[in-house]
Each structure stands twice: as structure tokens, then as C-alpha cells.
Regions:
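Juxtamembrane membrane-water interface segments that cap and precede transmembrane helices
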Residues: 46-51, 115-118, 191-206
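Alpha-helical transmembrane segments and terminal signal-anchor/GPI-anchor hydrophobic tails
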Residues: 277-282
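Structural signal for the C-terminal ends of transmembrane alpha-helices
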Residues: 16-27, 42-45, 69-82, 141-151, ...
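Interfacial loop-to-transmembrane-helix boundary motif in multi-pass membrane proteins
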Residues: 32-37, 83-97, 130-133, 141-175
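Alpha-helical transmembrane segments of multi-pass inner-membrane proteins
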Residues: 137, 154-180, 185, 195-272
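Membrane-embedded alpha-helical segments of multi-pass membrane proteins
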Residues: 5-17, 42, 56-75, 129-137, ...
Length: 282
């Protein structure tokens, strides 16, 4: 596989500046959403700036850390990390410290005929613990800025808008094969043969695998369904058209799993109240 080009690393470096401007111009809810979602959709996959000791800076860690910095430095806001409930604190600490258990139980080396794989050391767990904490940052920030009806609607709007915008490169790749990441970032991020389906291709765009694109499209489709359910009568024709279009895009993804989830989850969104939805999600 070819290596990422200069544009890929340049994107990693400029994304914090882009996010800083979004946090200056948008309300905190939308700024947070597009910092995380935008980075997920357009930043290069499998590309990282490797620094000693600290976690790799990639399309996950850079948006998450940038959002935290913008919230605390630009907005001068205080972000509560640990929940008030003891059970919540225990679960978060267990998630963050789990890499230590992995290291302690994988200290033996593996010996093969041609090579040897060294056992894990305590040093290996340091970056892993930091990575676990970074993964949780969007949840802490989301609790602060998205825990309102307006914040929830902003998430739905962003998912639908992102799905519609992403459909353009998806359609290009479905027709001409997954090439966007090669054209922009200089490499293909997975096994090309896994993109060949049903006489055509599954789009990958800037995500790591075609399944990731399919599940993102599913999320956009479910968000569109929720918006259609709550839309006023005058806005329903447009909302229905977007829903049908995103359903077509899910078919373009040529993945059976997301279709099964769609059939399973759609009735919950349409016919069931929020209390039951939360219980099912739990």
C-alpha cells in the first residue's frame, strides 16, 4: 500500500485551525458536531503524526482534542469529565484503565519459526490509556452542549446534511470504483477486492472501509426518518424526498448489515416513544 502524501499530513495539521474558526463563528453545539463529524468524514484514514509517548495524532484524536481545547480556551467553559453517579465514575475509570489489564495479561513473547513478537510492557499501556480517554471526550462535550432538544435536533440536521453531501463522492466511487482517497491523499486504505460487490463497487471515500460508509449512511437515513416524523406538514414533502434519496444511497453501499438494522430500528423511531427507545439502546 502506498504511503499518505503531503496533502494527508497537511490536512491533519490544518484541521485544528478550521475547527478554531468554526468555534468562533458557530454556536457551541454546531461547532462541536462539525468538529467531530467533519473530521470523521474528510480527514485521511490510517494516517497519523507519530510522537513519542503521547498518542498518535489522527482523524480521531485531533478533532476530539481540538474540540476540548476550543471549549476550554476559546469559550472559557468548564467541562465536567466524571458524572455524579458512582456507577458512572466506575465505568469510565474501568474503560480508561482497561489497557493496563491487557498489558499485564499479555507479557509473554510469541515465538515463530521466522520471527518473534515481543510481549507487551507497561510502557505500551501509557499511550493506550490516553487513547481511551481521548475517545470519551466527545461524550463529555456532548453532555455539555448537546443535552437539549435544540442540541439533539442539531445532531439530526448535521447527520442528514453530511449524508447528502457525502453522497456525491459516494456516487462517483460507486460508478468508477473507490478512488477518492487515492486522488486526494495518495493511497488506498483497505483491500480493494472487498469493495467489489454485485457487479459494481461499494463506496469508501475517506473512511476506512465500505462498511463504515454504509453505517454512516444508515445513521443519516435514520436521522432523516426522525426529522420526517416531527416535521410540520409544509416541510414533509422535502423531508420525504431526502429520506427516499438516502435510502437509495444505502442501497448504493451494497451492504446487507445496515439494511437489517434499518428494518429493525425504523419501527422504533416511528411508533415507539423516547423512553422505550432509550431502554432498547441500553
Amino acid at each position: 500500500m502506498a504511503s499518505p502524501n503531503v496533502i494527508a499530513y497537511l490536512m491533519l495539521l490544518i484541521w485544528p485551525a478550521v475547527c478554531w474558526q468554526m468555534w468562533k463563528r458557530l454556536d457551541p453545539a454546531r461547532a462541536l458536531i462539525w468538529t467531530i463529524l467533519g473530521g470523521y468524514l474528510i480527514m485521511p484514514p490510517m494516517t497519523a503524526i507519530n510522537l513519542p509517548i503521547v498518542p498518535d495524532l489522527d482523524k480521531v484524536s485531533i478533532p476530539n482534542l481540538t474540540a476540548l481545547i476550543c471549549a476550554t480556551w476559546l469559550l472559557k467553559d468548564k467541562i465536567t469529565i466524571l458524572p455524579s453517579a458512582p456507577v458512572g465514575k466506575a465505568l469510565i475509570l474501568l474503560f480508561i484503565l482497561a489497557p493496563f489489564a491487557t498489558v499485564l495479561t499479555n507479557g509473554d513473547a510469541l515465538y515463530f519459526e521466522m520471527r518473534t513478537i515481543q510481549g507487551m510492557k507497561i510502557y505500551d499501556s501509557v499511550a493506550s490509556v490516553a487513547n481511551q480517554a481521548i475517545v470519551l471526550l466527545p461524550f463529555f462535550l456532548g453532555r455539555r452542549y448537546l443535552g437539549t432538544p435544540e442540541g439533539t435536533r442539531a445532531v439530526l440536521v448535521a447527520l442528514v446534511a453530511g449524508g447528502v453531501a457525502y453522497s456525491v463522492p459516494m456516487l462517483i466511487e460507486a460508478r468508477f470504483s473507490p478512488q477518492m482517497n487515492i486522488w486526494v491523499y495518495g493511497f488506498f486504505q483497505h483491500d480493494f477486492f472487498q469493495t467489489i460487490r454485485q457487479g459494481g463497487f461499494r463506496p469508501v471515500v475517506f473512511l476506512q472501509h465500505g462498511l463504515w460508509v454504509a453505517f454512516f449512511t444508515l445513521m443519516a437515513l435514520l436521522a432523516a426518518l426522525a426529522m420526517l416524523r416531527d416535521a410540520p406538514a409544509a416541510a414533509r414533502p422535502r423531508a420525504a424526498a431526502i429520506l427516499i434519496y438516502l435510502f437509495y444511497m444505502l442501497l448504493v453501499c451494497k451492504s446487507a448489515g445496515p439494511l437489517v438494522y434499518l428494518v429493525s430500528l425504523s419501527p422504533l423511531l416511528v411508533f415507539v416513544g423516547s423512553r422505550v427507545q432509550i431502554l432498547v439502546a441500553a
